[in-house]
């Protein structure tokens, strides 16, 4: 018994006859006169099919290409159903987290915007794994670095996402990281006029770092000096032309991108250095602080200008793949938990949580790290010893080691990359279980753990990198209006890339 109504069955039968007739008609136009007899036989076949299905051979009152259009509509509806199913699943997770953690709630304000579903998918032309992704500082452009050394650029506004706006053969081996400068860089001065523009850098397993013009995507210079794979790079937030890099050769290097010189090299790990993050000190004379993570299963905080190690974070049981500073406006979510649960941290001085040195001088306090033990860890870093007119010294408390605050558990395989939401409340993590997960720091104080509030599953392979659109240059703000300022500069663009050879744009 058919599941279709008589009217639906009649439409389907007529669409089948129309489809077969169109194929024969299209083929007949390309045949020579002597081959027409075969076509006539095929036309007889159409008449027989129409007679068998009890429908007329004429389809003048039927929509052109009716069967194909019905088929494509079904596929679109299936994709829409899958997206809506994912969204319902995410909303259920949020509701469950709210009930389990004392009513913590995510508002619909722009400041709390979170990605929910894939808006566009950008396939790589070279069919190569995507190792790194980056969003342009102000244009609607997405950039990806691939395992064959290619850089691909897509325009979000283009109707056809399958064709990149530009594809550059950038390196002879895999591109491991792409990073944009935090603000325009003055590369040259011509006829007394400033020539500032955004630049970006790429690093590779071919041992090189390349600096590129952000307007033309043309290569400016090559930085060489590492003796092994260059794992990651980051521009200085306080000095736009300064670039930091880490490598499998165990070193951290500091470069001046305007002339290509390496200004400092230091070794802080005993094995491959995988990733780094940089933050500017609140007291400008201190310069920058660098977080690095390594195959030696440790995270190291260093003073950039001197290379001095300030503290060590030990607790992972496998290679650490990614590390990120938390912004100072994240502190409120964690401070409350530590003050209410001081008995869980007997080695932590009670006054440390409220110590003004973090906010007034250092500009750092908490960080997160992720690794091949499938865990994201939250840390409190002890404050460095600050001296007048001299570089800081290692922390004097807890033997210069950080305090492990909490584990963010849920990933089923290696966690490869981290991203911090501009509002400082949410942490993004992604990895080899094909998922991107969102964690809410505000649930730590209410429920005693950092809860996963979203899980995004659209990649068909490992997720290697995630990136959110950077904020425009910050203005002078007070603590009272910092979130309002961040909200005004947010672009709500989030991308991911992985071994399924695609970049996904999330909405």
Curated annotation (Swiss-Prot):
GO terms for cellular component: cytoplasm; microtubule; microtubule associated complex; spindle pole. It comes from the Eukaryota. GO terms for biological process: cell division; establishment of mitotic spindle orientation; microtubule sliding. One of its GO terms (molecular function) is dynein complex binding. Positively regulates the activity of the minus-end directed microtubule motor protein dynein. Plays a central role in positioning the mitotic spindle at the bud neck during cell division. Targets cytoplasmic dynein to microtubule plus ends, thereby promoting dynein-mediated microtubule sliding along the bud cortex and consequently the movement of the mitotic spindle to the bud neck. Belongs to the WD repeat LIS1/nudF family. PANTHER family: WD REPEAT-CONTAINING PROTEIN POP1 (PTHR44129). This is Nuclear distribution protein PAC1. It comes from Meyerozyma guilliermondii (strain ATCC 6260 / CBS 566 / DSM 6381 / JCM 1539 / NBRC 10279 / NRRL Y-324) (Yeast).
